[in-house]
A protein has these predicted regions:
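Short coil/turn segments at secondary-structure boundaries
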Residues: 104-106, 119-122, 268-276, 351-356, ...
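Activation/maturation switch segments at domain boundaries
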Residues: 433-483
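Extended, helix-rich architectural segments
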Residues: 1-159, 483
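Extended, charged amphipathic alpha-helical segments
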Residues: 210-369
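Surface-exposed loop-to-helix/strand elements on domain peripheries
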Residues: 78-83, 88, 283-285, 307-428, ...
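Glycine-centered helix-boundary capping/hinge motifs
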Residues: 97, 346, 451-452
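Extended, regular secondary-structure scaffolds
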Residues: 111, 116-243
Length: 483
């Protein structure tokens, strides 16, 4: 299968993707935990080369997973200008399992450097070029960097792009669905849809099932949002692609797996062994064949046959050998590498490090309370993530307006990330109370922020509080007259 041929057939230049694909392949291999050029090796034992596979601690996957959990989890809350809009948006997100999808999208995007959330309309009916949106729904999906092909971009990011989806068939052929998001002369987005069949020999044939080849969105809002780590691409300063969160830490990942593999070998090669002479054997009375007096599946024993034991054990039939394991040295080396990795990836040196006595790691709260590097890293990544989420929300609203199903109030878009482990909320709330008392912060803003609701809802809540306060004062006044 050669997607480059498909793109060339459509008049696009795939060179940007082709030149970048070697880095994607490298990061994918480390994300999976097995880089063939590093983890597969040979060692000469004095007789022949023995093929070996190096053990992997799978740290690259762990980095991306942990950062995704810190950035987007169940505590992230999105509110719009009014309560009704917030409910509509939340339903669209819930229908698409967005919380799980976004968390996984961030993990994969941080692994490969780039990812894309794509929005579409599903379940539409087309009758003689008339589109019926009555039963349509907003569809949110994720496309990884291997299937993203930038068409135009500037310093603010990708403006036009093509994405590819594959459906494999049992006969070895594949259905390739190509979508291109292009700006037309009116600077509105047109989505071009094409479907191809690719056979085993990479022959590409366009299928006739390509209704709505050109779909006008009638908006300048892109129906896609790029997700990338907020890290400058130092491999190619002019590339539209982002780089993996561990792109500049490959050598550290190698060092970690070298130590981890050595630790495993140390334990494996240094295990207890019992060497036994032929006197430890007994012979089958029927066949005369030698048999072991101990469990034949026990790999602790090694029979020497006619050889004799050495040194003080030469008159014995069994000699015990115990290797000296260098566990402490390996753990110290591993810990040093993990500290370097934490610093290189923005987690801080203590995040992945462990106590060499208890082998326990610190919690995120403990790490952040002692080191603000992770705090700054999360806040840095949240800048791009918030921008992507706002684009997704605007795209959802664009689809709602196009289909006539809903219109969101985008006068206010609040994205409240889970900062509970990286900020002193009590201190921040205390400061806001002081501002409130000094009339430098409005009650509505205070209620909106700390209740996690829109300003419209906060205004209603403030009025309820005022009404209740007035009612209570009236009761106290009447009670005073009675007394």
């Amino acid at each position: 299968m050669n997607i480059e041929n498909v793109l060339k057939k459509m008049g696009l230049n795939p060179d940007v993707y082709v030149n970048w694909s070697k880095y994607l392949n490298l990061w994918v291999s480390w994300y999976k935990g097995k880089n063939a050029s590093f983890h597969n090796y040979t060692i000469y034992n004095g007789i022949k080369d023995v093929k070996k596979e190096r053990a992997s601690l799978q740290v690259a996957k762990f980095i991306c997973e942990k950062m995704a959990d810190l950035l987007y989890n169940e505590k992230v809350k999105i509110t719009l200008g009014n309560e009704e809009s917030t409910k509509i948006l939340q339903k669209v997100l819930d229908d698409n399992n967005f919380q799980l999808k976004m968390n996984r999208a961030i993990e994969k995007s941080f692994a490969l450097g780039t990812g894309c959330i794509v929005l579409d309309i599903e379940d539409i009916m087309v009758n003689e070029s008339v589109i019926d949106y009555n039963n349509s729904n907003v569809k949110i999906s994720y496309v990884n960097a291997e299937n993203i092909f930038p068409i135009s971009w500037d310093e603010d990011g990708i403006k036009e792009l093509a994405i590819v989806e594959y459906n494999m068939k049992s006969d070895g052929t594949a259905i390739c669905i190509l979508k291109m998001y292009m700006l037309n002369p009116r600077l509105k987005y047109t989505i071009y849809n094409y479907k191809f069949t690719i056979d085993k020999n990479n022959n590409i044939v366009e299928t006739p099932e390509t209704y709505l080849k050109e779909f006008e969105t009638n908006t300048n809002v892109p129906w896609f949002a790029i997700i990338s780590p907020n890290i400058v691409n130092n491999i190619d300063l002019y590339s539209p692609y982002g780089i993996s969160i561990f792109a500049n830490s490959i050598d550290v990942l190698k060092g970690i797996d070298l130590v981890y593999d050595s630790l495993n070998n140390e334990i494996n090669l240094g295990r207890k062994r019992l060497f036994a002479t032929k006197e430890a054997l007994r012979f089958n009375s029927t066949t005369g064949e030698p048999q072991l007096n101990f469990d034949p599946n026990d790999v602790v024993f090694h029979v020497l046959g006619d050889s004799t034991l050495l040194g003080d054990n030469k008159n014995s039939i069994i000699q015990e050998i115990n290797g000296n394991l260098r566990i402490d040295e390996h753990l110290k080396s591993l810990n040093s590498q993990l500290r370097i990795l934490g610093d290189k990836t923005g987690f801080g040196g203590d995040y992945f490090a462990f106590d060499e006595k208890t082998l326990s790691t610190k919690t995120a709260t403990e790490v952040i309370s002692e080191n603000s590097e992770l705090f700054r890293t999360i806040k840095k990544h949240e800048i791009l993530l918030e921008s992507a989420l706002i684009r997704i929300i605007k795209a959802i609203n664009s689809i709602g307006e196009l289909t006539g199903q809903f219109k969101l109030d985008l006068s206010q878009i609040n994205i409240d990330f889970d900062d509970s482990i990286i900020e002193n909320k009590s201190q921040e709330r205390s400061e806001d109370r002081q501002d409130l008392a000094q009339d430098t912060l409005s009650r509505i803003d205070y209620i909106s922020k700390w209740r996690g609701i829109s300003k419209e809802e906060a205004a209603i809540k403030a009025q309820e509080i005022d009404n209740e306060k007035s009612a209570n004062e009236g009761i106290r006044f009447i009670e005073g007259e009675i007394n």
